[in-house]
Structures are given as C-alpha cells and as structure tokens.
Amino acid sequence: MKFYLVGGAVRDMLLGITPKDKDWVVVGATEDEMLANGFIKIAANFPVFIHPQTKQEYALARSEKKTRNGYHGFEVNFSKYITL
C-alpha cells in the first residue's frame, strides 16, 4: 500500500503556500484493506475514505474509460493493481 499526495495541496506546495487540506491517492490496496486499517468509507459509488485521525481524504487509484456521451458515460475500474 502506497500513498501519494495529489491535487491542490501539491499545487500549493509548489507555489510556496501552506495547503489547507490534503488529498491522497492509494495504490496497492482494496476497499477491505482500507477498512481493516481503520479508514472510514464516505462515498457509496467510489472507494473514497477519510483517515480516522487526520480526517484527510484517501481515494483508491482508478482508471476511467469513456463509454457514452455526457457526464455519466464512464466505465470505472478500481483495483489494487492500478498504478499512477
């Protein structure tokens, strides 16, 4: 299980700004492993979790494939074998 800082926190750090919050992508884990490590699942359709102490957001790595027009036309794959 590896954790990668992503999103606005990375941008802020590159600009010399202290991030207000931190979001993470998790590689090499399953939903069950995250739950077993005390993370709290917060999204019904996506494996997104909150760390129990820091309250920071952790999302499992995923791949997306466009299958139809519009915002809902995606096939999403979550696997512990997806890498960045």
From Swiss-Prot:
A molecular function (GO) term: metal ion binding
Keyword Transmembrane: no
Binding site for CTP: G8, R11
Known EC number: 2.7.7.72
Catalysed reaction equations from the record: a tRNA precursor + 2 CTP + ATP = a tRNA with a 3' CCA end + 3 diphosphate; a tRNA with a 3' CCA end + 2 CTP + ATP = a tRNA with a 3' CCACCA end + 3 diphosphate
Pfam families tied to this protein: PolyA_pol
Keyword match Cell cycle: no
Biological processes, Gene Ontology terms: tRNA processing
List of residues binding ATP: G8, R11
UniProtKB keywords: ATP-binding, Magnesium, Metal-binding, Nucleotide-binding, Nucleotidyltransferase, RNA-binding, Transferase, tRNA processing
Family: Belongs to the tRNA nucleotidyltransferase/poly(A) polymerase family.
Protein name: CCA tRNA nucleotidyltransferase
Organism per entry: Francisella novicida
Gene behind this protein: cca
